[in-house]
């Protein structure tokens, strides 16, 4: 259900704004999106796993907060994030 360290490093590398960037909103949204996709796939075979579903809702809420922050700061970056990670608004 969680992502591997190698996959996380790859996601960070592809979404970093500069080298060594691990905390920008873009990177955080990318990591959360990866975890959300993994959990969504998990629920296809474990539909009654309500404990993990609660964690999924928390991840979605955190990602929504980060996206709201990016939208407030820079609308173009926000739209690029939505398009890049196929996030519905």
From Swiss-Prot:
- State the GO CC annotations: cytosolic small ribosomal subunit
List keywords of the entry alphabetically. Ribonucleoprotein, Ribosomal protein, RNA-binding, rRNA-binding
The region called Disordered is annotated at 1-25
HAMAP family hit by this protein: Ribosomal_uS15_B
State what this protein does. One of the primary rRNA binding proteins, it binds directly to 16S rRNA where it helps nucleate assembly of the platform of the 30S subunit by binding and bridging several RNA helices of the 16S rRNA.
Q: How does it assemble?
A: Part of the 30S ribosomal subunit. Forms a bridge to the 50S subunit in the 70S ribosome, contacting the 23S rRNA.
The protein, known as? Small ribosomal subunit protein uS15
Offer one example of a GO biological process linked to this entry. translation
Q: Which gene encodes it?
A: rpsO
Q: Where is the composition biased (Basic and acidic residues)?
A: 1-11
Q: InterPro entries from the xrefs?
A: Ribosomal_uS15 (IPR000589), Ribosomal_uS15_bac-type (IPR005290), uS15_NS1_RNA-bd_sf (IPR009068)
One GO MF annotation is: structural constituent of ribosome
Q: Which Gene3D superfamilies match?
A: 6.10.250.3130, S15/NS1, RNA-binding
The record's family statement is: Belongs to the universal ribosomal protein uS15 family.
Pfam families named among the record's database cross-references: Ribosomal_S15
The record, for SUPFAM superfamilies, names:
S15/NS1 RNA-binding domain
């Amino acid at each position: 259900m969680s992502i591997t360290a190698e996959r996380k490093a790859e996601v960070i590398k592809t979404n970093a704004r500069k080298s060594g960037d691990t905390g920008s909103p873009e990177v955080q949204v990318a990591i959360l999106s990866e975890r959300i996709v993994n959990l969504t796939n998990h629920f296809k075979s474990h539909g009654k796993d309500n404990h993990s579903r609660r964690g999924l809702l928390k991840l979605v809420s955190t990602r929504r907060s980060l996206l709201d922050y990016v939208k407030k700061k820079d609308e173009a970056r926000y739209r690029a994030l939505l398009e890049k990670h196929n996030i519905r608004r």
